[in-house]
């Protein structure tokens, strides 16, 4: 006998999920603080740096809205296409506040990278940080009219987008501010080590490290 076909998640299923979570009136301490969305899973190699930055700051990924991880600060991620699944994009933006999101990082590529700026308009006043996945996506992401704000980083700089998201949260959470300061100090220390090595070893010795 043929195998049973595997069930597939539909766009309507995801919209129902988001709307149910929005209606749940969950404790903000248990909901994701940062939402990471991207237009395609092919954007993930660029967007992975955002996960790295948040993990370095002590965030944890939340994959179940009803069961938060032990970490106080969390993030979630979805693939949301502005062109192929516009209904999902609208649902994600419209439910952002009720679902407890404080900031959204949105990445998209191509010349019509509309996900970040459309999400910024829909989710307003939740801040959205746009990540152009490619250089050709920059103009599309930053091209917002007066009164429709979006924060954007340079092409491919999802790590910086995550730091900016953490800065937004740091205004209300001292623990995140402390982690940002510590991370900055670590990065400064790394530059100092390299600088001393170059000076003390000379260029030839430095290259042979």
Residue ranges and their predicted role:
Residues 1-7:
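Short, Lys/Arg-enriched N-terminal segments with co-localized hydrophobic residues
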Residues 40-41, 80-82, 109-110, 133-136, ...:
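Short, ordered loop/turn segments at secondary-structure junctions
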Residues 10-18, 23-25, 29-31, 42, ...:
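C-terminal binding/interaction regions
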Residues 50-56, 93-94, 120-123, 167-168:
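Short, solvent-exposed amphipathic alpha-helical segments in soluble enzyme
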Residues 87-132:
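Glycine-rich phosphate-binding loop
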Residues 24-82:
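Glycine-rich phosphate/diphosphate-binding loop of Rossmann-like nucleotide-binding domains
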């Amino acid at each position: 006998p043929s195998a049973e076909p595997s069930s597939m998640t539909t766009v309507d299923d995801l919209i129902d999920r988001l709307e149910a979570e929005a209606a749940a009136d969950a404790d903000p301490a248990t909901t994701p603080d940062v939402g990471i969305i991207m237009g395609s899973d092919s954007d993930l190699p660029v967007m992975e740096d955002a996960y790295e930055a948040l993990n370095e700051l002590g965030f944890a990924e939340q994959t179940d809205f009803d069961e938060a991880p032990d970490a106080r600060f969390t993030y979630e991620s979805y693939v949301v296409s502005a062109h192929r699944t516009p209904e999902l994009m609208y649902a994600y933006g419209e439910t952002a506040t009720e679902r407890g999101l404080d900031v959204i990082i949105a990445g998209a590529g191509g010349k019509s990278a509309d996900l970040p700026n459309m999400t910024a308009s829909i989710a307003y006043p939740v801040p959205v940080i746009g990540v152009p996945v490619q250089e050709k996506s920059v103009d599309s992401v930053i091209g917002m009219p007066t009164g429709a704000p979006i924060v954007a980083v340079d092409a491919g700089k999802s790590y910086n987008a995550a730091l900016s998201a953490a800065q937004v949260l740091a205004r209300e959470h001292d623990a995140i501010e402390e982690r940002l300061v510590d991370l900055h100090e670590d990065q400064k220390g790394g530059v100092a080590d390299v600088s001393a090595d170059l000076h003390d070893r000379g260029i030839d010795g430095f290259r042979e490290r």
